[in-house]
Amino acid sequence: MRCLALDIGGTKIAAAIVKNGEIEQRQQIHTPRENVVEGMHQALGKLLADYEGQFDYVAVASTGIINNGILSALNPKNLGGLAEFPLKASIAKHTDKPIGLLNDAQAATYAEYQLQNSEQVSNFVFITVSTGVGGGIVLNQILQTGSRGIAGHIGHTLADPNGAICGCGRRGCVEAIASGRAIEAVSSQWEEPCDPKEVFERFRKNDEKATALVERSAKAIANLIADLVISLDIQKIAIGGSVGLAEGYLPLVEKYLQDFPSIYCCEIESAKFGQDAGLIGAAYWVKDVLLDKPEGTIYG
């Protein structure tokens, strides 16, 4: 079956035909930043028109929360201020094919889990450390989406009760300490301001302030991993995202994990899928979990 896969992020919308895990005819456009509701309707309509007649079903991975076909966000800033959007209904205006929706980090998790030996790893987590911090959870070989679509929003667990206010409105979330946005909130105030990419360049040159900032992020992720392992008996974790895959970051996380008792630790690896993880994961998940159900139920 041929899938039209869409990956809606805070800055871009990617689209492609996915067949047997292979990407074809990939394109990417900017996520609307002005008149975002109407802009999103128009963007989706154009993408559906571009691929008309070339797909058997639609799979969407999107930043934010997917619940009953509605897209919303814990942190609306991640979607250009878009607080709520009828995502499934918008797509359904342009196609009568089946539609399935899920969170982008959940989709990436499903893609990464396809690379695991499910008989050896039944409890798995993917963590993305990028502009924000997100993730997905597989328990007993099943991707957890939750009754409200919020399962896996691990970036909004507590890291520091006295920390900065997160974009979700809570104080001290992991995202408010470990993310690229959190790193930039500090580095932009330095005497010589810089973005997260330059922070890591300075970190690799042993700059004191940059090292402290990267270490703060890595410690928060190490503690998050320990919490996940001890609460859910996680066997393996993959870390991705622009921060998570930055040179020198994963070894720091592993270093801080070694300070904990061994029961809090598990195997950690770098995520294998790159920018197309959401597209591939969504295509696989919709086919495996929704289309292949005997009753054929499609939901999002």
UniProtKB/Swiss-Prot annotation:
It is an enzyme of class 2 (transferase). Belongs to the ROK (NagC/XylR) family. NanK subfamily. Keywords: ATP-binding, Carbohydrate metabolism, Kinase, Metal-binding, Nucleotide-binding, Transferase, Zinc. Homodimer. This is N-acetylmannosamine kinase. Zn(2+) binds at residues 156, 166, 168, 173. ATP binds at residues 5-12, 132-139. NCBIfam families: PRK05082.1. PROSITE patterns: ROK. GO terms for molecular function: ATP binding; N-acylmannosamine kinase activity; zinc ion binding. Its EC number is 2.7.1.60. It comes from the Bacteria. Pfam families: ROK (PF00480). It catalyses: an N-acyl-D-mannosamine + ATP = an N-acyl-D-mannosamine 6-phosphate + ADP + H(+). Catalyzes the phosphorylation of N-acetylmannosamine (ManNAc) to ManNAc-6-P. The gene is nanK. InterPro entries: ATPase_NBD, ManNAc_kinase_bac, ROK, ROK_cs. Pathway: Amino-sugar metabolism; N-acetylneuraminate degradation; D-fructose 6-phosphate from N-acetylneuraminate: step 2/5. GO terms for biological process: N-acetylneuraminate catabolic process. SUPFAM superfamilies: Actin-like ATPase domain.
